[in-house]
Each structure stands twice: as C-alpha cells, then as structure tokens.
C-alpha cells in the first residue's frame, strides 16, 4: 500500500476532461436539464415503495414583521402508530449574517428532527438576511422540498397545507392549500405548476375571504411541484414539491426520469 501511494506521486496529472467555454457554462447555468454537456439521468421510472410520511412545513412573517417563522410537522393522522418522523435540512442560499462574527455568509444551514406526531417552530430574524430579503430552502426525505421568499412587506395571507386521496385507488391524491386573506385589501394569488402539466390558476380573495386551491397528482402518481406568488409583491413566493403518501406504492419521480418537462418561467 505504501508503494502504491508513493508511485501515485509520479503519475501524470489527469487530462481526460473537457474545458468548458463561457457560452457552454452559460448554457448549463440557464438550463442544466437541457444541457448536452452534463451527464443525463437514465430515462424512465421504477416502482417506489409507499412511505409513512405525512409532512407539513408552512411559513409566515411573525406579528411584529421582524422574523420569518417556519413550522415543521411530522403528522401521525394518516398513518397512526406507523407514522414516521423526519429530518429537515434548511438552507439560506443567499447572504445570512453569522450571529457570532456579524459577517454575512452564504449557504448557512440548520438541521432539525421531528418525531412522529410532533411539530416544532423556528424563526429567523429578517435583518439577518441581506437587504431584509429572506430566502429559505427546506429539504426533507424522498424529494420533499419547500422554498420561502419574501420580506417584511409580505401579503397578509394564511396558507395551510393538507392532502386527501383523489377517490380512485388511493395511489394518488390531491394537494390542498387553504388560502385566507387576512388583510383589508383585495389580493390576487397565482399558482403555477412547475413540472407536471397542471397549468396555472388565479385566485382572487376579498378581505377576510378564504378559498382552497386543489392540485391533482394523478398524472404524476402522487408527485407535485408548484409555486405560489402574489400580484404586486415581487419578493414574495412559496414553492411546494414532493410526493403525497397515501399508503400505496407509487413510482419514482417522473420529472427526474425525463417523462415531464420543468417550467419555472
């Protein structure tokens, strides 16, 4: 082993790589899924076991409008004693102020674990984000993902997630997002499917009005990916991705398998 290590120091420097041009780098950054340069995921899907996850992450500005609060939940309402807890990894991909050094850093992160039937909350002060613009990405198991963007001027909305079976064979479900206008002005909300060809919806809410948005997942066998924005507030957005778990086996993500095309325009 020592001889192999010593001999390795005399080997040629690897040269079996391609140096990318500026235009190729730009192409990859703009549309990595369509890039002919990057390695490709093998196309197609495979059977995927049911998992006893019933996870919810919702976020809102606190009453003083000085912090963004995320509530993490691993519910046991659907699976009872078989329900699973979950790890959550949360990133601030932009500049976030280190409380020890008081300097801005990128890719700050926090790890959480929530046991079955439990929930927890955590808050981040807005002044710790550069320019007061918060941006948090939440990663959970099996493709679970949430993204929160905004600032102190977020619209006064209540967003509560849930899901149910679609009435078929219980393999797929309907993601339900209850949207309530807590302000004293009219709000117009747009919900856009990013991957699974469900198009766009516009929801107009009078002051105090509450309406549900239902996102079907039958085309994608439980997988979903959609973004919510509010007219007149370019900083605010919420993104919801993952797979609805209903106790039945499904398939791996058809977007990852190249059977759907992503659209984030």
Regions found by a protein language model. Give the residues of each.
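Membrane-interface soluble catalytic domains
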Residues: 1-265
């Amino acid at each position: 082993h020592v001889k192999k290590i010593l001999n390795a120091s005399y080997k040629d420097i690897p040269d079996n790589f391609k140096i990318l041009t500026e235009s190729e780098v730009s192409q990859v950054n703009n549309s990595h899924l369509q890039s002919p340069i990057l390695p490709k995921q093998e196309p197609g899907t495979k059977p995927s076991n049911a998992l006893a996850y019933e996870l919810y992450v919702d976020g809102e500005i606190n009453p003083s409008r000085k912090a963004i609060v995320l509530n993490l939940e691993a519910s046991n309402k659907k699976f009872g004693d078989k329900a699973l807890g979950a790890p959550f990894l949360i990133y601030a991909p932009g500049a976030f102020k280190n409380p020890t050094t008081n300097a801005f850093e990128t890719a700050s992160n926090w790890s959480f674990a929530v046991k079955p039937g439990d929930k927890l909350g955590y808050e981040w002060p807005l002044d710790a984000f550069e320019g007061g613009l918060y941006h948090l990405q939440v990663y959970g198991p099996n493709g679970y993902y949430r993204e929160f963007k905004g600032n102190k001027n977020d619209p006064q909305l209540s967003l509560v997630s849930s899901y149910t079976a679609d009435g078929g064979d219980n393999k797929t479900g309907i993601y339900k997002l209850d949207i309530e206008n807590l302000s004293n002005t009219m709000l117009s909300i747009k919900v856009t499917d990013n991957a699974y060809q469900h198009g766009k919806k516009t929801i107009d809410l009078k002051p105090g009005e509450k309406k549900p948005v239902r996102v079907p997942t039958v085309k994608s066998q439980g997988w979903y990916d959609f973004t919510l924005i509010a007219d007149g507030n370019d900083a605010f957005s919420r993104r919801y991705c993952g797979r609805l778990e209903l106790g039945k086996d499904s398939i791996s993500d058809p977007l990852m398998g190249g059977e759907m095309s992503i659209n984030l325009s």
